[in-house]
Amino acid sequence: MAENIENNGCSQRDNAEHEGYVKASRSFNRIWKERDSAQPRLLETILYKDNFNRAYKRVKANKGAPGIDGMTIEEALPYLKEHQQEITDRIYRGKYTPSPVRRVEIPKPDGGVRKLGIPTVIDRTLQQAITQQLVPIYEPLFAEGSYGYRPNRSAKDAILKVKEYAEQGYTFAVVLDLSKYFDTLNHEILINLLRKNVKDERVVQLIKRYLKSGVMENGVVIDTEEGSPQGGNLSPLLANVYLNEFDQEFLKRGVPCIRYADDIVLLAKSRRASERLLESSTKYLEERLKLTVNREKSRTVSVFAIRNFKFLGFALGRNGKGTYVRVHLKSWKKFKSRLKELSSRKRCQSIKPSLEKIKVYARGWLNYYGIASMKSNIDDINGWLYHRIRMCIWKQWKKPRTKYKNLVKLGIPEHYASTIANSRRKYWYISNNKAVIWALNKERLINSGFYDLATAYQSVHVNY
C-alpha cells in the first residue's frame, strides 16, 4: 500500500511537471511566432537566392576594384556559383569571417586624404544583400531632413530644402564638420542602435563581424576598433542609422536640420539662436555619439554669405525676385581648373579624345549643378572654353603650311590665311583672331564633338 501511494505521488508530480512544461512550451512557441510575424527571419531573407543574385548584379553594375584577394567581379561569379552554399552554411552557423578591407587613399580638395576600405567582391555582394533587406526597415524611420544615400533623394533636394527654409526666415546656419566621420563610428553605440530595429540577432552579429574585419595597409592587417570604412556597400546605411539619432533629437527640438551623409546644416532665425545651436549640437555629437566636431571648420554663418556658406558645393543668393540657388565660388574654381587641365595644349595632341573627355566631365557637372542660377557664368566659361579649343586646334596644325591649307579650306582668303599662318604671335593670341574664330566657329566645333555648355545648361536648368 505504501508503495502504491509512493508511486501514485511520483506519478502525480510527474504529471504536474509535464503539464507545466507543456503550458510553458506553448507560451514560448506563441511568443516566438508573434516575434517572427513582427519581423520575418531576416537572415534567411538576406541569403535568399533571388536577393543574393540581385546583390551580385548591383555590385557588378557598380564595378570597382578587387579587395585583398585580388578577385575581380568577373572571377567572382563562377566562384559564387561553386561556393555559395558553403558560404551561406558558414553564415548560418556563425562561422563566416569577412576578409579585411584593402586600404586606398584618395586625395581631397583641401589637401588631405580620404581613406577608403575596399572589401573583396564576395564581401561586397554579402553587404549589398544585407543592405537590400535593411533599407525597407529603416527608410520609414529616417528623418525627413536626411538626404544622403537614400532612394529618390539627392543633394539637389537638400539644397532646395535649405532654400525653402531661408524663404521662411531661417537665414542663419550652423554648418557642422565632422572629423573622419566614417572612420570614428563607435561600434558599441552602432550595434545597440541596430538592435532597436533589427530583431534577428544573427544579422546584428554578422554586421558586427564586418565592422571588426580589419584593414590591410602596406601588407599588414590592422584591427578596426571603430569606424565603418567608406567603400563598403553597407557603410552608407550604417552611417545614416548612426546619425539618425542626431536628426531625431533636433527634430524633437523643432530645429530645421538638413543632412547629407556627414554634411550637416542646422537653421535658425537669428545669429544668437544659431550660436546656441552650434554649442548644443556640438555637445550632443561629442558626448552622446562620441564623434569629433572639427571646431575650426564648424561655424555659424548667414546663408547668404558669399564665401562662407557652402553646402554640398552650393550656396544661396537673393535679389529682387527672391532667393535662388547658386554654385559656390570654390566649386566654380574647381570646375574651371579641371576644364583648363582637360583642354591644355599638352592634352590636345588629338582633339577628338580631348573633346570627349570634356563632354563627359562637363555633362556630369551640369547634371549635378544644373539646378543653380548661373547663366552669365556659364556663358563666360563657354566662351573661354571655345577659345581654348581653338588654341588646341591651332597648335595641332603645327606647321605654317598646314595652318595655311586648313584656313583656306575653311573659307579664309589666301592672302589673309598666309599672314595668319606665318604669324609669330602666341597660340592664345592667334586663336582669338577674327579669321580663326570665323574658321573655327561654334557650329563647326559642335559638329566636331564640342559640348556647348550654354545649350546644355539651358536644357538641364529648364527642369527647375
Model-derived features with residue positions:
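Short, solvent-exposed helix-loop connector elements
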Residues: D223-E226, Y324, K340-P353, W365-N377, ...
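Phosphate/adenylate-binding "loop-and-lid" substructures adjacent to NTP/NAD/dNTP-binding pockets
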Residues: P66, G70-D110
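Extended C-terminal regions of large enzymes
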Residues: R388, W397-Y464
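Non-catalytic, polymerase-adjacent accessory regions of viral genome-replication enzymes
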Residues: M1-K81
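A glycine-rich phosphate-binding loop feature that marks nucleotide/adenosyl-phosphate handling sites
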Residues: K297-I306, K357-Y361, I378-Y386, R401-L410
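A conserved non-catalytic segment of reverse transcriptases
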Residues: K212, R288-E356, Y361-R363
